[in-house]
């Protein structure tokens, strides 16, 4: 059963228990746009404890936000008590009219604030933008995200209020900023999104991010491509903004920062070299090398076909250090005292094998290292 159908099942269950309940927000928006629905939110007049009494298995209550998560086959479904006394009051408080939509169990759309018309116009609008943005300043960045992901245009009142209130973005938690910025970067219309942030001045109010005008110009030239990978999105960002230092203050996972740093190093290598050397391909890895060629192609730079890279990778004598025919134990047999020299020797052996200066055979490698030591 799809999460969309599971949502309707939950709505029917709440209705049968005597409570108003509706699928709301992005799920309804995406349904009307003909997009796949990936997650479902439900608004109800029932309190969290009443919801938990109805859905007894595996529920998780967030009392602060009056939300209950119930398990589903395709992921959890979020059920939230009305913000206000009625559905209309709840929808009024939502960020944009295109998200202020609800659907009954019979698929009747409830649209008190013109969200369907705005969907048709491809317009991003807030009901009382001044209030909506002051309630949650992150909505200014969310506006840019929807411009990128949906290809919509912000209405002039939203632009005006973002310009007025942009300084409030500094109060937003950086974790929330990262989520929205990543979704923006993954969208097709990044140029329009960054143009909105530039016009309003909001780009210079994002906490943890310092972007120069020239870097912003680079971001606005990102290719019109949709990326599923967060690693790819942040690598594109790093290339445009001068490297990992531009992301140092952002709470990204350590592994992601490491992958971005490795990707940036590989990109800079290809900026100065027409081909991948065997050694650079080895230390970068095939996945990163292929990603760099995709990035170059997207920027209309000369690029190497994936098949050619895969063939070069396949011809490498080893694909990882663990493939090396010797270990530190083999080195100790040749030289009794352990020490830093072992790491250096293994690295030299690894490079010699990859670059085909030495076959990947124990005796040959030990002989190579002996000659190297004698030549020092």
Swiss-Prot record:
GO molecular-function term, one example from the UniProt record: nucleotide binding
Q: What class of enzyme is it?
A: transferase
Give the signal peptide, or none.
none
Q: Which residues bind CTP?
A: 26-29, 94-95, 99, 136-145, 176
Q: Which reaction does it catalyse?
A: a tRNA precursor + 2 CTP = a tRNA with a 3' CC end + 2 diphosphate
CDD domains cross-referenced by the UniProt entry: NT_ClassII-CCAase
Which InterPro entries does the record cross-reference, listed alphabetically?
A: Bact_CCA-adding_enz_type3_sf, CCA-adding_enz_C, NT_sf, PolA_pol_head_dom, PolyA_RNA-bd
UniProt KW keywords: Magnesium, Metal-binding, Nucleotide-binding, Nucleotidyltransferase, RNA-binding, Transferase, tRNA processing, tRNA-binding
Q: Quick one: which residues bind Mg(2+)?
A: 39, 41
Give the GO terms filed under biological process for this record. tRNA processing
For activity, the cofactor(s) needed are:
Mg(2+)
Q: What is its EC number?
A: 2.7.7.-
**What Gene3D superfamilies does UniProt report for this protein, alphabetically?**
1.10.110.30, 1.10.246.80, 1.20.58.560, Beta Polymerase, domain 2 (3.30.460.10)
User: Which family does the entry's similarity section mention?
Assistant: Belongs to the tRNA nucleotidyltransferase/poly(A) polymerase family.
Q: Which NCBIfam families match?
A: PRK13299.1 (NF009814)
Function of the protein: tRNA nucleotidyltransferase involved in the synthesis of the tRNA CCA terminus. Adds the two cytidine residues to tRNA.
Protein name per its UniProtKB record: CC-adding tRNA nucleotidyltransferase
């Amino acid at each position: 059963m799809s999460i969309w159908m599971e949502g309707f099942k939950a709505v029917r269950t709440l209705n049968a228990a005597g409570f108003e309940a509706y699928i709301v927000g992005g799920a309804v928006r995406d349904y009307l746009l003909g997009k796949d629905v990936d997650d479902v939110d439900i608004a109800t007049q029932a309190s969290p404890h009443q919801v938990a009494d109805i859905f007894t298995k595996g529920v998780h209550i967030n009392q602060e936000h009056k939300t209950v998560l119930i398990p589903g086959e395709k992921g959890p479904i979020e059920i939230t008590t009305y913000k206000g006394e009625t559905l209309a009051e709840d929808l009024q408080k939502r960020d944009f009219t295109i998200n202020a939509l609800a659907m009954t169990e019979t698929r009747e759309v409830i649209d008190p604030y013109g969200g369907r018309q705005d969907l048709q116009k491809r317009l991003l609008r807030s009901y009382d933008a001044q209030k909506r943005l002051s309630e949650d300043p992150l909505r200014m960045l969310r506006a840019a995200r929807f411009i990128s992901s949906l290809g919509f245009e912000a209405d002039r009142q939203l632009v005006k209020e973002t310009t007025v209130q942009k300084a409030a973005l500094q109060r937003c938690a950086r974790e929330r900023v990262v989520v929205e910025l990543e979704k923006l970067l993954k969208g097709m219309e990044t140029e329009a999104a960054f143009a909105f942030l530039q016009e309003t001045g909001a780009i210079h109010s994002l906490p943890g991010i310092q972007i120069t005008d020239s870097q912003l110009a680079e971001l606005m030239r990102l290719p019109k491509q949709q990326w599923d990978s967060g690693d790819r999105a942040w690598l594109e960002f790093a290339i445009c903004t001068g490297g990992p230092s531009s992301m140092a203050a952002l709470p990204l996972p350590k592994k992601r920062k490491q992958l971005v740093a490795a990707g940036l190093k590989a990109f800079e290598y290809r900026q100065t070299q027409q081909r991948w050397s065997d050694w650079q391909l080895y230390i970068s890895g095939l996945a990163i090398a292929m990603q760099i060629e995709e990035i170059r192609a997207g920027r209309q730079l000369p690029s190497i076909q994936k098949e050619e890279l895969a063939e070069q990778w396949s011809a490498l004598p080893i694909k990882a250090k663990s493939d090396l025919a010797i270990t530190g134990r083999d080195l100790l047999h040749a030289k009794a005292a352990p020490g830093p020299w072992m790491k250096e020797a293994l690295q030299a052996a690894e490079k010699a094998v990859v670059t085909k200066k030495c076959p990947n055979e124990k005796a040959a490698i030990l002989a190579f290292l002996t000659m190297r030591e004698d030549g020092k």
